[in-house]
């Protein structure tokens, strides 16, 4: 995970290139349009949008929705933080988000299997 807001562009590009040269993929985490542009300039193949503002720790899924159109479909687009319900995932799917990173909802869950099934939309009757 490479955080675009922390790394300068040259360092970010070197890290992305090193990962690719080693046969690995790197998620470049962003939170703003400027950071998404930086990630695209350095050739990121996976771009994550952190919905949590690390300055005040507020969470807004609209961060992902606002930035989605900046990234072509050939780049994997990941929404990170603040995803708690199946409805959140359905909203993100509707906007062609390729993957989600779920941490807090799973960590707070007492029944992780059930929580994962609910998030995936698996009916208990199936």
Residue locations for each model-derived region?
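Glycine-rich phosphate-binding active-site loops on the catalytic face of alpha/beta enzymes
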Residues: 1-7, 48-57, 97-115
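Active-site mouth loops of central-metabolism enzymes
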Residues: 4, 25-29, 78-83
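Short loop-to-alpha-helix "cap/lid" segments that border enzyme active sites
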Residues: 7-15, 31-33, 37-42, 54-74, ...
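Short, hinge-like loop/turn segments at secondary-structure boundaries
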Residues: 17-20, 44-47, 65-66, 118-120
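Glycine-enriched alpha-helix->loop->beta-strand junction motifs that scaffold or abut catalytic
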Residues: 20-24, 41-48, 72-74, 93-100
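Catalytic cores of alpha/beta
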Residues: 32-42, 79, 83-102, 114
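C-terminal helical cap(s) of enzyme catalytic domains, especially alpha/beta-barrels
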Residues: 66-70, 93, 108-126
């Amino acid at each position: 995970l490479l955080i675009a807001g922390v790394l300068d562009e040259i360092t970010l590009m070197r890290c992305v290139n090193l990962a690719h040269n080693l046969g690995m993929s790197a998620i470049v985490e962003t939170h703003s349009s400027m950071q998404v542009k930086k990630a695209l300039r350095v050739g990121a193949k996976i771009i994550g949008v952190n919905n949590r503002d690390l300055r005040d720790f507020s969470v807004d899924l609209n961060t992902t929705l606002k930035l989605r159109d900046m990234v072509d479909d050939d780049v994997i687009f990941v929404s990170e933080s603040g995803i708690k319900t199946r409805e959140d995932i359905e909203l993100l799917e509707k906007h062609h988000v390729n993957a989600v990173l779920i941490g807090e909802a799973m960590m707070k869950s007492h029944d992780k299997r059930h929580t994962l099934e609910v998030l995936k939309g698996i009916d208990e009757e199936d």
